[in-house]
A protein has these predicted regions:
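Double-stranded RNA-binding/processing signature
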Residues: 1-119
């Protein structure tokens, strides 16, 4: 059974939230700062920027997955910019895809994002 791209994105969205929360849980001094640190990183603009940052590290197959995921028809909220939202969906799709099919790559990118990019 083949998994649809939107299902990878759904999983990737949850994974990204957990990654950020794991990192921020011991960094914040109170609930307000914890929420602020998390929401600054769990949003379409931030994920769009991350995908652009890691683009040069992606394999041709991963870049093809990004291209296909950008074109998934998804509802876009009023406050989101369409191009950013589509790139964020592609980022989430990559995270979900790696988690299901290539745990080593998932861990590699998770470590890179934690150490060098997001914090």
């Amino acid at each position: 059974m083949e998994i649809q791209l939107r299902n990878y994105a759904h999983l990737g969205d949850a994974l990204w939230e957990v990654i950020v929360r794991e990192y921020t849980v011991d960094k914040a001094v109170n609930a307000k700062s914890l929420h602020k640190m998390t929401t600054e990183r769990v949003n379409a603009k931030f994920q769009h920027d991350l995908l652009i940052t890691i683009d040069e590290l992606l394999t041709p197959e991963e870049k093809d997955l990004v291209r296909r995921a950008r074109n998934i028809p998804v509802p876009i909220g009023r406050r989101n910019i369409q191009s950013e939202y589509r790139m964020a969906t592609a980022f989430e799709t990559l995270m979900g895809f790696w988690y299901i099919h290539n745990k080593d790559r998932f861990e590699e990118m998770k470590d890179l994002l934690n150490k060098k990019i997001i914090f």
